[in-house]
């Protein structure tokens, strides 16, 4: 599993040496413009940024704070949201920024690595004649990468893990090779060098230098987000090796820059990349191959992190329910087809807009600084409420100060492409906010009825033979977690317009557990044999095939006598003659012109319903399509007050009452069907009594066929003192 950790979580931070030093030289005016002070200052800032941000903040502190093994900003928010509603704001903002960064990482990592092919002498002419060749190769690699995601990160991680192990070993060896000529660069371990150069007049980039240094820490947030995929212990075990390899390579590049700062061959070179130039031409071939592989792996780290984050956002009701697959046996390794497709299309769009890594890197990093800042805020709140208040203050002040410098420096990228990531962040944030607000508004109108309120009406409808059956069984799918009461939406659906009479009504909800293969259900029958509240508890790897489970429950209850016997005379989709017809009903909320809701609330609801329409339907999620489910729309926030009466403007016509052709009795003498003193009334009463008697006979026959209770409960059925014992009562809730 440690090899999987290498492949899944370290790809992003492992590609930073490809472009960090190159970006530093570009900001300082080239290799000829830097001196020893500049090189040591840059190395010092890089080393301490990796140490403080990645090692201290994420590896040593953040990873100790998990939600059932899951990491990331949403998992962290789930732990502390009880401390204030305002915490949703930084959590949403940080999550949106992370997802926006997930679009840019594959584009910048893979394109920058592929462009290394241009440094190989035999291929220089080919790329000069075909400038778009690099872009085409990058597109092919990205399409292949997203296509293999459905195989799961376990299989991908094993392959990528071995490659990353070779990659970081290669980084360390190349770094040591160049360090052997000048070990003095380790003076940069002194943080004074970094602070001094940052504020030195020789720093041509000014505060923007911190934006370059920040590139060395990209991937740190992915360590925390991907913790659920590979486990905290595996990251602890592998991180020391990763950090040593990174430091050796950065310092090796620094030693090469000091050794060649006066070499005209390199000082005149545009877009000089010390990473490739510090190697001999023969080694450079291997470097290009490995760097392309590392770029692919870096993309993998962000893709898996995006899957995890969207899954957590769904559980928080910040995003719509999406189809989730679990290719491996652990819940942390998941695959979301819709997210995979959106990321793929968005990444290709980035390549189409920015063309090459130079322009993509101008937009890269700004969104990630926002994620790191919001994570710091949430971690500080967690530490504060954990009783470590002094530590919380020190932690929050220190890391907010550092990351504020990163953010200010990265804002210089806004006009050079940073606007794109901000646009993506705003779009994702809009989805989260509107979905959350829309859900809150829907739940604000949700009401529940106690059994004493709904049972009399249902009992009357159940025994009213004058109304034909809508179906033998009507199954309502609901997201309501209440099991002791009934959602009024279901009650109104049953009685709206033409009442939906049935032999049995079912209200069904699904709860996904953290265990992979849980298959349980509980039933509440409210003391009747015609209404059942069912709650499924299904493991995250168990298929949510509701029709199959509903049939099992009906058979189970029929065998115990809790559900009256049913027989299907005509052919059905499920071909199950022992169960009557089943009709599934889904209730969707909708705004109406007369809905009484604020403009902001209406916007949130309309946006939510538009997103829901694009995200898919529960009909597909639960396999209901073959059963022709009924989708009902119920209005939100509609006033029950009658509108003012209309005024008629034309002249009303008086229609004379027709004269009867034969004498009729006085209306007062016409028997009332509900008047038991009249013949018709007595007939209706007799018919009702017959129906009730038939219902009692059916219930008694079903009870007689039911198997006797086992164990201690069976003893209660024995006679005492020659008198039959009372019939044992069924518990309100049974767990299967």
Curated annotation (Swiss-Prot):
<dbReference type="InterPro" id="IPR053952">
    <property type="entry name" value="K_trans_C"/>
</dbReference>
<dbReference type="Pfam" id="PF02705">
    <property type="entry name" value="K_trans"/>
</dbReference>
<feature type="transmembrane region" description="Helical">
    <location>
        <begin position="84"/>
        <end position="104"/>
    </location>
</feature>
<keyword id="KW-0630">Potassium</keyword>
<keyword id="KW-0406">Ion transport</keyword>
<feature type="transmembrane region" description="Helical">
    <location>
        <begin position="287"/>
        <end position="307"/>
    </location>
</feature>
<feature type="transmembrane region" description="Helical">
    <location>
        <begin position="1"/>
        <end position="21"/>
    </location>
</feature>
<feature type="transmembrane region" description="Helical">
    <location>
        <begin position="414"/>
        <end position="434"/>
    </location>
</feature>
<feature type="transmembrane region" description="Helical">
    <location>
        <begin position="364"/>
        <end position="384"/>
    </location>
</feature>
<feature type="region of interest" description="Disordered">
    <location>
        <begin position="649"/>
        <end position="678"/>
    </location>
</feature>
<keyword id="KW-0472">Membrane</keyword>
<feature type="transmembrane region" description="Helical">
    <location>
        <begin position="42"/>
        <end position="62"/>
    </location>
</feature>
<dbReference type="InterPro" id="IPR003855">
    <property type="entry name" value="K+_transporter"/>
</dbReference>
<protein>
    <recommendedName>
        <fullName>Probable potassium transport system protein Kup 2</fullName>
    </recommendedName>
</protein>
<keyword id="KW-1133">Transmembrane helix</keyword>
<feature type="transmembrane region" description="Helical">
    <location>
        <begin position="204"/>
        <end position="224"/>
    </location>
</feature>
<dbReference type="GO" id="GO:0015079">
    <property type="term" value="F:potassium ion transmembrane transporter activity"/>
</dbReference>
<feature type="compositionally biased region" description="Low complexity">
    <location>
        <begin position="660"/>
        <end position="677"/>
    </location>
</feature>
<dbReference type="InterPro" id="IPR023051">
    <property type="entry name" value="Kup"/>
</dbReference>
<keyword id="KW-0813">Transport</keyword>
<feature type="transmembrane region" description="Helical">
    <location>
        <begin position="156"/>
        <end position="176"/>
    </location>
</feature>
<dbReference type="InterPro" id="IPR053951">
    <property type="entry name" value="K_trans_N"/>
</dbReference>
<comment type="function">
    <text>Transport of potassium into the cell. Likely operates as a K(+):H(+) symporter.</text>
</comment>
<keyword id="KW-1003">Cell membrane</keyword>
<dbReference type="GO" id="GO:0015293">
    <property type="term" value="F:symporter activity"/>
</dbReference>
<feature type="compositionally biased region" description="Low complexity">
    <location>
        <begin position="700"/>
        <end position="709"/>
    </location>
</feature>
<keyword id="KW-0812">Transmembrane</keyword>
<feature type="transmembrane region" description="Helical">
    <location>
        <begin position="126"/>
        <end position="146"/>
    </location>
</feature>
<dbReference type="GO" id="GO:0005886">
    <property type="term" value="C:plasma membrane"/>
</dbReference>
<feature type="transmembrane region" description="Helical">
    <location>
        <begin position="334"/>
        <end position="354"/>
    </location>
</feature>
<comment type="similarity">
    <text>Belongs to the HAK/KUP transporter (TC 2.A.72) family.</text>
</comment>
<feature type="region of interest" description="Disordered">
    <location>
        <begin position="693"/>
        <end position="736"/>
    </location>
</feature>
<keyword id="KW-0769">Symport</keyword>
<feature type="transmembrane region" description="Helical">
    <location>
        <begin position="239"/>
        <end position="259"/>
    </location>
</feature>
<dbReference type="Pfam" id="PF22776">
    <property type="entry name" value="K_trans_C"/>
</dbReference>
<feature type="compositionally biased region" description="Basic and acidic residues">
    <location>
        <begin position="710"/>
        <end position="721"/>
    </location>
</feature>
<keyword id="KW-0633">Potassium transport</keyword>
<feature type="transmembrane region" description="Helical">
    <location>
        <begin position="390"/>
        <end position="410"/>
    </location>
</feature>
């Amino acid at each position: 599993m440690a090899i999987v950790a290498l492949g899944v979580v370290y790809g992003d931070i492992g590609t930073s040496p490809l472009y960090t030093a190159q970006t530093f030289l570009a900001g300082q005016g080239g290799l000829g413009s830097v001196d020893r002070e500049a090189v040591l200052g840059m190395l010092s800032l890089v080393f301490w940024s990796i140490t403080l941000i990645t090692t201290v903040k994420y590896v040593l502190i953040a990873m100790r704070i998990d939600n059932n093994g899951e990491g990331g900003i949403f998992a962290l928010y789930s732990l502390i949201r009880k401390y204030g509603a305002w915490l949703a704001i930084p959590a949403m903002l940080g999550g949106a920024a992370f997802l926006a960064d997930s679009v840019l990482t594959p584009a910048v990592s893979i394109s920058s690595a592929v462009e290394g092919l241009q440094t190989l002498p035999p291929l220089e002419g080919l790329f000069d004649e075909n400038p778009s060749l690099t872009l085409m190769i990058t597109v092919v690699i990205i399409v292949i990468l997203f296509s293999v995601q459905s195989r799961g990160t376990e299989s991908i991680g094993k392959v990528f893990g071995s490659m990353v192990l070779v990659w970081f070993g290669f980084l360390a060896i190349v770094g040591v090779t160049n360090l052997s000529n000048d070990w003095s660069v380790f003076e940069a371990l002194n943080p004074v060098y970094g602070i001094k150069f940052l504020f030195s007049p020789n720093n041509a980039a000014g505060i923007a230098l911190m934006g370059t240094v920040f590139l060395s820490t990209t991937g740190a947030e992915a360590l925390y987000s991907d913790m659920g995929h590979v486990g905290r212990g595996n990251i602890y075990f592998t991180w020391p090796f990763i950090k040593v390899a990174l430091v050796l390579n950065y310092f090796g590049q620094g030693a090469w820059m000091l050794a060649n700062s006066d070499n005209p061959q390199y000082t005149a070179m545009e877009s000089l990349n010390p990473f490739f130039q510090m190697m001999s031409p023969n080694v450079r071939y291997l470097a290009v191959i490995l760097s392309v592989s590392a770029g692919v792996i870096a993309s993998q780290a962000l893709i898996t992190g995006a899957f995890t984050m969207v899954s957590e956002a769904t559980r928080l009701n910040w995003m719509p329910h999406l189809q989730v697959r679990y290719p491996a046996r652990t819940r942390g390794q998941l695959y979301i087809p819709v997210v995979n497709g959106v990321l793929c299309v968005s990444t290709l769009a980035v390549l189409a807009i920015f063309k090459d890594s130079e322009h993509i890197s101008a937009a890269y990093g700004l969104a990630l600084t926002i994620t790191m800042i919001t994570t710091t805020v949430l971690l500080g709140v967690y530490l504060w409420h954990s009783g470590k208040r002094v530590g919380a203050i020190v932690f929050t002040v220190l890391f907010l100060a550092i990351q504020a410098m990163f953010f200010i420096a990265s804002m210089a990228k806004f006009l050079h492409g940073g606007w794109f990531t901000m646009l993506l962040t705003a779009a994702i944030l809009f989805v989260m906010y509107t979905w959350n607000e829309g859900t809150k508004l829907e739940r604000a109108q949700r009401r529940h009825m106690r059994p004493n309120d709904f049972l009399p009406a249902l009992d009357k409808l159940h025994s009213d033979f004058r109304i034909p059956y809508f179906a033998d069984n009507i199954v309502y799918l609901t997201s309501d977690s209440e099991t002791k009461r009934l959602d009024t939406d279901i009650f109104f659906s049953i009685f709206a317009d033409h009442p939906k009479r049935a032999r049995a009504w079912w209200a069904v909800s699904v709860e996904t557990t953290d265990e992979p293969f849980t298959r349980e259900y509980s039933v509440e029958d409210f003391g009747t044999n015609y209404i059942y509240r069912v709650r499924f508890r299904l493991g995250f790897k168990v298929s949510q095939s509701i029709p199959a489970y509903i049939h099992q429950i009906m058979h189970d209850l029929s065998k115990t006598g809790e559900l009256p016997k049913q027989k299907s005379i005509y052919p059905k989709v499920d071909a199950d003659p022992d169960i009557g017809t089943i009709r599934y009903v889904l209730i969707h909320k909708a705004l109406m012109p007369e809905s009484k809701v604020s403009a902001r609330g209406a916007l949130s609801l309309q946006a939510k319903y538009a997103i829901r329409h694009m995200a898919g339907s529960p009909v597909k999620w639960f396999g209901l399509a073959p059963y022709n489910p009924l989708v009902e729309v119920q209005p939100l926030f509609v006033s029950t007050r009658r509108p003012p009466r209309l005024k008629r403007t034309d002249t009303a016509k008086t229609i004379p009452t027709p004269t009867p052709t034969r004498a009729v009795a006085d209306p007062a003498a016409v028997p009332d069907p509900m008047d038991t003193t009249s013949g018709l009334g007595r007939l209706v009463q007799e018919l009702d009594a017959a129906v009730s008697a038939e219902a009692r006979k059916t219930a008694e026959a079903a009870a007689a066929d039911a198997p006797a209770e086992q164990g201690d409960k069976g003893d209660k059925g024995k006679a005492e003192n020659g008198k039959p014992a009372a019939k044992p009562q069924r518990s309100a809730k049974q767990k299967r």
